[in-house]
Curated annotation (Swiss-Prot):
Family that this chain belongs to: Belongs to the UPF0161 family.
Record key words, sorted: Cell membrane, Membrane
Protein name (database record): Putative membrane protein insertion efficiency factor
UniProt key word Metal-binding: no
Keyword Nucleotide-binding on entry: no
Compartment(s) of residence: Cell membrane
GO cellular component, one term: plasma membrane
Taxonomy, superkingdom: Bacteria
Lineage: Bacteria, Bacillati, Bacillota, Clostridia, Thermoanaerobacterales
């Protein structure tokens, strides 16, 4: 299941993301962060970390460097 979710994120990175303007305020991007978090911590914890990251990626947050810890 973990690999399938990562596969879906990679599809998003390859086919959907290039059609949209760059809006992620963080480095690495939210999709790359999600892949790293799910790979390192598994689907449940990594997924929750990804959701929290995506919720923080908005105009009211300055963003910046935020690696998976």
């Amino acid at each position: 299941m973990k690999n399938f979710v990562i596969f879906l994120i990679r599809l998003y990175q390859k086919y959907i993301s290039p059609m949209k303007p760059r809006t992620c305020r963080f480095y690495p991007t939210c999709s790359q962060y999600s892949i790293e978090a799910i790979s390192k911590y598994g689907l449940l914890k990594g997924g929750l970390m990804s959701i929290w990251r995506i919720l923080r990626c908005n105009p009211f947050n300055p963003g910046g460097y935020d690696p998976v810890k």
